[in-house]
Every structure is written in C-alpha cells, then in structure tokens.
Amino acid sequence: RLSEQFNGLDDVLRVFDSGIEHLEVRDSGRAFVLTFTGREPITISERGLVEVLSSGTVRGLGLVQRAMRVLRSGGYLLVDEVENHLNRQLVNVVLDLFAARGTNPKGATLIFTTHYPQLLDHVHRKDNVFFLARRGCGARVVKYADRVKRIENKKSEVFASNFVKGTAPRYADVRALKELVAEEVSDER
C-alpha cells in the first residue's frame, strides 16, 4: 500500500522514477508530500499520487514493499504477471532480490507468472522453472529441468519453440488469424 512509510522509501521510488526526490506519508496515508527533483513539494491525496506517478512506479513500489515483507521473514510471494507495468530490467532487479543471500537470508521464494519468457533467461537455475502448458481443454504443469537437459538452451527459446508442447500458439492457429485479419482489412471486401 502506498500509505506505508518505511526507511528507504525514497531509494525504492528512485529506482522506478529517478525524478522523485522525496515522498512523505502523512495522516496515516491519507495525504502525501511529493517532491520531484528541482521542484517545490506538493501535498496530494493517495488518489492524486496515483495520478501523478506512473503506473510502473506505483506497481514497482508495491511489489518491493511486498517483497521486503517476505524477505524479512521467509515464506512465499505470489505475483501474477510480474512484468505488468515494469520494464524487464526492473523485473530482473526484483528477481535478483530473491536470488541473492544478502537480500534473501531467510530463503524466501518468489512464485510468478509471466507472458514474457525472456524473463526466465535471468533465472540461473533450471530446476525451479515450470511451464503451464495447454493440454486439450485443460493445462498441465511441466518442470523445465525434466524436459530440457542441456543447460546452454535459453529458457525463452525453449518456450517460444513449443518444444514443451502447449507453451506457444500453434502455427496453424497463428496462420489462420493472419489470414482472417488480411481478409477483413482488404479493400476488396
């Protein structure tokens, strides 16, 4: 929640928006004093803050706050679509918090979903990567290490190649979509 003041709040915010100099939480999160570099401070509500900050900054701050709670005590952090509103480098920063002993002394675990398999290339171990693969009307969980033995394979390329069947759209379906769109936008209709 944006209403949490904590040590290092400004440092976290600057990772996601380098133009932020300071954010102070007031009145139990009902008001905020926001200062951008080289500007006068402004006092705004939480709603106003969300309108002034980018969705990536708001999402990043919330993600880091939740991560810090889990990293302090151990446990699990579940994040659906970890890349939402964040660029890949910033997602990698969050992934690194869980991979390093210095920031994860209690062995906390990050479990995330993503539509961007390139993020998986940043995960060094292959025994903790799972794919959700389509199977008929349902899905199945496939452990990457059980299907791919070679360590030099990029996880994103394995995913995109549909080596693990059901992880990528079928070629015939993609071709049919392109043909449909071409027909619909054609001047000859």
Where are these regions (language model features)?
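Conserved D-loop-proximal element of ABC-family nucleotide-binding domains
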Residues: 84-88
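C-terminal lobe/lid and adjacent interdomain/linker elements of RecA-like ASCE P-loop ATPase modules
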Residues: 17, 35-38, 73, 92-189
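A short linear-motif detector with a strong N-terminal bias
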Residues: 2-4, 55-58, 89-92, 108-112
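Hydrophobic "anchor" residues on beta-strands that sit immediately upstream
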Residues: 76-77
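Walker B catalytic acidic pair
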Residues: 80-82
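Phosphate-coordinating catalytic segments in nucleotide- and nucleic-acid-processing enzymes
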Residues: 1-68, 72, 162-166, 184-189
